[in-house]
């Protein structure tokens, strides 16, 4: 069973919210620019994800894969915006393509395709941090 929740998807995006440790040179980057997007993936999203405990990483990965496979553009955008990011999403990519780009950066050798959706179980919010 793979535990998922939309909050895990939002956790990935929270690294793009304003924080005391954010490098000021990154603020205002345009994610439609490929170099800027790569920089944000490398400097913000990946280190933040890497800092999560293993079980949270696993759930973020599973939740992101589920979102890519089954959510529409509107819900993908809403999950991105729920983290109150400092960056507008790229205007030259669909939200799904943006999510796939982030997936490729975080999990370069893994496929996001889901063959057995019944393996994925949505857990309640109060269970997010329970192993």
Where does each model-flagged region fall?
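Amphipathic alpha-helical binding modules
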Residues: 77-131
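Alpha-solenoid helical-repeat scaffolds
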Residues: 2-6, 31-35, 54, 58, ...
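Amphipathic alpha-helical interaction modules
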Residues: 22-75
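Short terminal alpha-helical segments
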Residues: 1-45, 103, 125-128
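C-terminal catalytic/scaffold cores in eukaryotic proteins
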Residues: 12, 16-17, 63, 79-80, ...
């Amino acid at each position: 069973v793979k535990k998922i929740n939309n909050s895990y998807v939002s956790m990935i995006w929270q690294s793009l919210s304003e924080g005391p440790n954010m490098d000021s040179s990154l603020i205002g980057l345009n994610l439609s620019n490929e170099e800027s997007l790569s920089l944000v993936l490398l400097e913000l999203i990946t280190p933040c994800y890497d800092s999560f405990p293993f079980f949270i990483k696993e759930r973020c990965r599973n939740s992101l894969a589920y979102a890519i496979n089954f959510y529409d553009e509107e819900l993908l955008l809403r999950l991105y915006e729920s983290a109150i990011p400092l960056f507008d999403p790229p205007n030259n990519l669909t939200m799904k393509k943006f999510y796939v780009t982030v997936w490729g950066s975080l999990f370069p050798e893994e496929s996001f395709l889901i063959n057995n959706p019944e393996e994925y179980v949505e857990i309640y919010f109060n269970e997010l941090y329970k192993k």
